[in-house]
Amino acid sequence: MPKKFIFVGPESSGKTTLCKLLSEKYNTLWVQEYCRVAAEEKLQNPNIDANAINFNFTLDDFINMAHRQNKEEYELSKKCDKILICDNDTFALTIWCERYLHKYYSEIYDIYKNADYLNNDNKIYILTKPNVPFVQDGYRDGEHIRDWMFDRFIAEFTKYNMKYYIIDSPNYIERLQHAIDIIELNIQ
């Protein structure tokens, strides 16, 4: 089972960019954020106003996303030897669910916690601070709550006594180097 490096954080804080660059550097696979995929699929629906950026997610949507995220992580982890890079995971989805539904739902955390087959103890979380410019890509709508989300991640990591690192440089090159340093420290 590979060591898993999970990049989490608010919107437009560089997670996906880091995941892509690190998967190339380490010649490994990376798990995409399924919540993002689901949002893109919702906006493809002709009954949704794509200009409104209102996804109208439900708890059932998040439960389905959690199972899909776990499945993707599991399938890709079977194809990696040493390292798997993840753009969010089901633990992170608990906070995204709270962000969109305005309430914490333990059902999502339970899906994360009960996924023994994912070997969650083998994960290193890397939280990206939202101190880089917000980039609107047509799907994002949370610029005003990036600090809140960052604080929620810290609170949840603390609550569950989880190991995590923070990438806080506003410089993208330094952020990448910090991520590499974290990975190197944890794969030796």
Predicted feature locations:
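The conserved Walker
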Residues: 11
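Conserved lysine of the Walker
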Residues: 15
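Hydrophobic anchor at the beta1->P-loop junction of P-loop NTPases
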Residues: 7
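Pre-Walker A (Motif I) flank of P-loop NTPase domains
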Residues: 2-4, 81
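Conserved substrate/cofactor phosphate-moiety recognition/catalytic segment
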Residues: 20, 24-68
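Glycine-rich phosphate-binding loop used to anchor ATP phosphates in small-molecule kinases
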Residues: 61-119
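A glycine- and Lys/Arg-enriched "phosphate-lid" helix/loop adjacent to the NTP-binding pocket
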Residues: 101-176
